[in-house]
Regions:
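A hydrophobic alpha-helical transmembrane-helix feature that marks the membrane cores
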Residues: 1-251
């Protein structure tokens, strides 16, 4: 009996040690993802602010575009920026299994910077104070939703399928409203966008957590970290933009 007790205790300690190693590895993996995401968000914000200040002059309380502003906010540059950012995110997503982690991270940062160029135009529409306020509201909401996705024992995959269908419908509605310019439809789109990306934040966090494998080598884990960071970055940026349509103060 004493031999059984000793063997059982040794086995229990071994399982506990393995779980501790997995928990430590998972924690490091998730922290790396959040750090990469934060780097991307910070870079987007800095580039957007610098671009706006280079693109706009203020005279008598009124904003006017500089020659640089006219170039990036109108004409072919807008299309080039849109297609360039779309191409980058598709490249990272489709080629992630072939890219080295450092290369994937570099492409992610290039994408974040390019998106900062595009998003700098929000400063033309909304006041800086309201943008800052909505950013912190979005950050707090994102943090709470991501924490829920990380800690919940509930399987969110059925919700994820529903959210992806909702996202497709949202994109179609946004394209339609470009031509209709309907205020009520715009309000519905904004509300749906907030709800969809709130749900996606929790779902993606759970999915990223479940992708962790302590037996994989560092290269594969590094690729997953970059892809996870890009996914959460896009969730946050879209959540912020849809919230800005609700709570932002227009100039």
């Amino acid at each position: 009996m004493s031999d059984f007790d000793r063997n059982y205790a040794a086995t229990t300690r071994g399982v506990g040690a393995d779980r501790a190693v997995i928990d430590a590895g998972l924690r490091a993996y998730m922290i790396r993802i959040y750090n990469y995401m934060a780097m991307g968000v910070a870079l987007t914000g800095v580039v957007a602010w610098i671009t706006f200040n280079a693109a706009v002059t203020e005279t008598g309380g009124k904003l006017a575009l500089t020659s640089f502003g006219q170039m990036i906010y109108s004409g072919p540059a807008v299309i080039v920026l849109f297609l360039g950012t779309l191409g980058l995110v598709v490249l990272i997503s489709w080629r992630i299994d072939k890219l080295q982690p450092a290369t994937a991270l570099t492409l992610f940062m290039v994408y974040a910077g390019a998106l900062g160029l595009m998003l700098s135009s929000i400063f033309l529409t909304y006041t800086g104070t309201s943008i800052t306020r909505v950013f912190f509201i979005s950050a707090a909401s994102f943090g709470a939703l991501s924490l829920y996705g990380y800690t919940t024992q509930r399987d969110l995959s059925p919700i994820g399928s529903f959210l992806m269908m909702g996202l497709i419908g949202l994109i179609i509605a946004m394209v339609v409203n470009i031509f209709l310019q309907s205020g009520p439809l715009g309000f519905v789109i904004s509300a749906a966008g907030v709800l969809i990306f709130a749900g996606l934040t929790a779902w993606d966090t759970q999915k990223i957590k479940e992708m962790y494998d302590p037996n994989e080598d560092g290269t594969i884990t590094g690729r997953k970290s970059v892809m996870g960071a890009l996914t959460l970055y896009l969730d946050f940026i879209n959540l912020f933009l849809f919230m800005l349509r609700f709570f932002g103060d227009r100039r």
